[in-house]
């Protein structure tokens, strides 16, 4: 099945019908209503979940990992329910990573699977809803390592900017007597067709041997190269591997201040304070090294991080695991869900925190403080929870989330019925053309009168999870969108004008790379020549075209003027980026003859004089009839001599 790319808006219209009496609470567990029963009975540290839309119909689907049996995915039936589909992968151990993306760039999403033992592979999507195990996933063919070593999560990003997704795998091993290469984190370069090259040692990303739980790709310094972040348990500091652009990486976490040593359980990235810089949230246990409690690393304009959890009332001293940033109340700032499970004290209480903007009346400055939502929003639910992922499952404009547990607790599907506060939202997905199709690594920003909100697109994040690729941006009380900006992994920066693309609150859109409409300033050109004589001209020097987008000049792009050889057709000017046509406009050209230029060579000269003399006395239709009286006479000769020496364009 080919992707369905939606460029026009449509209103959220399909809403799940709930039984009477269930709407008293904002979030309602709909797993029973959807007839979805999923356990992770013998789970160790949790199993992966994903809300990726693998059939590309615009509705997030659900896929759960477990410790045994076939992987099951639930296909979203347009918000009315889910259809369970078993996949051809029999689990031999707890599944840590389930990640959907178009790994072979054929237009449909495939599935990557990683088990805790290190067993991993791909399920290829045939485009019609069927899947088959990729057979070349044994080490030596695709270079996917099958080492029997304890593994954590995984993530995909484009390390070399070639448009396909490369793979990072976390290993959960730190003992010195197990220092074989197979026990270190792995970096695999995608060579196409589900074939990978192991570049771990060459890249320098294997310098540490730690208890790595999760990785994430993010161009943190915005130099055009996707970097790799890794969180570690126990004694190993977290890492931030800067991509040097030549296939190698260097850990700069000690320089930037993100090398904290805790029992880091989640790698959750989000701009919680709306300053344009992405921040990091890490959960922790009671035994963390650099102080107890969760950690909030706030990124500053200079690229450095500072730990400020206490300043924002989010130093949570509990045994916590996965977390997810999401704007559940659509007020333009990110709220936070945190999953809890203490093996020594089971049945923990998960947390849903509201991000509140508080103003200091004395100074006029504002700060963001987190406070737990009341039970009217999210009720008490004592679970052994590990993994969370979010997305708008029923597309009602309010983000939902799914929690995966261990033991005898089945997964929760928390549906957001809305806060009744009048707030709106807009949902946007991306599709790459020059960039990887999933736009992994892209920076998506929505500007409205109240806020500018930026999100980074990931394939693998938080803890063992993959969020929906459709980002829900709360707009508060704003009734319009000012603009949408996309920084694509290819390096292209596009500005999408809401009026031109009909972007509005309450809408759902998928923006395709290269589809932004651009404006062009030009003047109608007048040429004293004929189309037949300029048809071979490349256009250079004839027109002065300035391409602009949202008032910003586009630089470094390729201008390609082309002549349309159809009679009387205008010039076509196009703007391209790496062979992708971004914009096109036509320029009207008014051709007029140069008086006396009878041979149309652009100059009135002796050759034209001979033609006038030859036609003296001609009556009717005559080329030398310059006064249009149907006769070539001395009057025409005098008119010709008045133009003698003229040249086209002068």
Give residue ranges: language-model regions.
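Solvent-exposed segments in extracellular or luminal domains encompassing
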Residues: 559-570
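Cellulosome-associated attachment modules in secreted, modular CAZymes
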Residues: 49, 583, 588-650
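Blade-edge motifs of beta-propeller repeat domains
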Residues: 24-44, 75-93, 124-149, 186-210, ...
């Amino acid at each position: 099945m080919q992707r369905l790319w939606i460029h026009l808006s449509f209103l959220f219209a399909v809403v799940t019908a709930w039984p009477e009496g269930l709407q008293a609470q904002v979030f309602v567990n709909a797993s029973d209503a959807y007839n979805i029963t999923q356990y992770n009975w013998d789970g160790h540290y949790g199993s992966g979940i994903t809300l990726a839309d693998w059939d590309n119909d615009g509705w997030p689907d659900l896929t759960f990992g477990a410790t045994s049996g076939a992987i099951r995915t639930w296909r979203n039936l347009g918000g009315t329910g889910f259809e369970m589909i078993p996949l051809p992968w029999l689990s031999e151990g707890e599944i840590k990573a389930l990640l959907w993306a178009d790994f072979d760039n054929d237009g449909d999403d495939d599935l990557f699977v990683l088990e805790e033992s290190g067993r991993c592979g791909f399920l290829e999507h045939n485009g019609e809803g069927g899947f088959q195990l990729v057979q070349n996933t044994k080490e030596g063919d695709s270079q996917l390592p099958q080492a029997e070593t304890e593994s954590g999560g995984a993530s995909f990003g484009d390390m070399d900017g070639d448009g396909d997704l490369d793979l990072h795998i976390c290993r959960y091993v730190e003992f010195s007597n197990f220092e074989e290469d197979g026990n270190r984190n792995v970096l695999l370069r995608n060579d196409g067709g589900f074939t990978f090259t192991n570049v771990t040692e060459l890249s320098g990303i294997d310098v540490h041997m730690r208890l790595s739980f999760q990785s994430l790709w993010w161009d943190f310094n915005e130099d055009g190269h996707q970097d790799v972040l890794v969180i570690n348990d126990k004694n190993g500091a977290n890492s931030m591997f800067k991509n040097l652009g030549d296939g190698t990486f260097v850990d700069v976490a000690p320089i930037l201040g993100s090398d904290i040593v805790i029992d880091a359980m989640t790698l959750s990235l989000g701009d919680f304070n709306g300053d344009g810089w992405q921040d990091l949230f890490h959960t922790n246990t009671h035994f963390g090294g650099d102080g107890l409690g969760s950690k909030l690393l706030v990124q500053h304009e200079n690229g450095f991080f500072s730990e400020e959890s206490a300043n924002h009332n989010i130093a949570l001293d509990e045994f916590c695991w996965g977390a997810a940033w999401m704007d559940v109340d659509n007020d333009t700032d990110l709220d936070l869900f945190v999953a809890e499970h203490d093996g020594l004290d089971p049945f923990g209480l998960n947390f849903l925190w509201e991000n509140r903007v508080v103003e200091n009346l004395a100074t006029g400055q504002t700060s963001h403080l987190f406070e737990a939502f009341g039970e009217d929003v999210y009720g008490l639910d004592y679970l052994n929870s590990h993994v969370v992922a979010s997305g708008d499952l029923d597309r009602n404009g309010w983000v939902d989330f799914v929690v995966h547990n261990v033991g005898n607790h089945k997964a929760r599907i928390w549906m957001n019925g809305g806060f009744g506060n009048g707030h709106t939202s807009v949902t946007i997905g991306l599709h790459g053309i020059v960039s990887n199709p999933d736009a992994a690594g892209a920076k998506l920003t929505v500007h409205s009168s109240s806020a500018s909100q930026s999100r980074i697109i990931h394939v693998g994040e938080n803890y063992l999870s993959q969020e929906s690729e459709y980002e829900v941006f709360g707009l508060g009380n704003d009734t319009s969108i000012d603009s949408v900006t996309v920084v694509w992994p290819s390096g292209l920066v596009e500005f999408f004008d809401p009026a031109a693309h009909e972007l509005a609150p309450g809408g759902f859109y998928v923006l395709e790379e290269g589809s932004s409409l651009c404006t062009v300033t030009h003047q109608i050109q007048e040429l004293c020549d004929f189309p037949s004589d300029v048809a071979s001209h490349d256009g250079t020097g004839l027109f002065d075209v300035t391409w602009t987008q949202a008032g910003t000049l586009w630089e470094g792009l390729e201008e390609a003027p082309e002549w349309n050889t159809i009679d009387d057709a205008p010039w076509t000017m196009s703007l391209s980026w790496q062979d992708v046509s971004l914009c096109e406009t036509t320029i009207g050209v008014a051709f007029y003859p140069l008086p006396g230029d009878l041979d149309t060579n652009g100059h009135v000269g002796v050759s034209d004089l001979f033609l006038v003399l030859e036609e003296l006395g001609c009556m009717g239709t005559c080329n030398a009839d310059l006064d249009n009286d149907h006769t070539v006479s001395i009057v025409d000769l005098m008119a010709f001599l008045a133009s003698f020496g003229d040249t086209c364009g002068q």
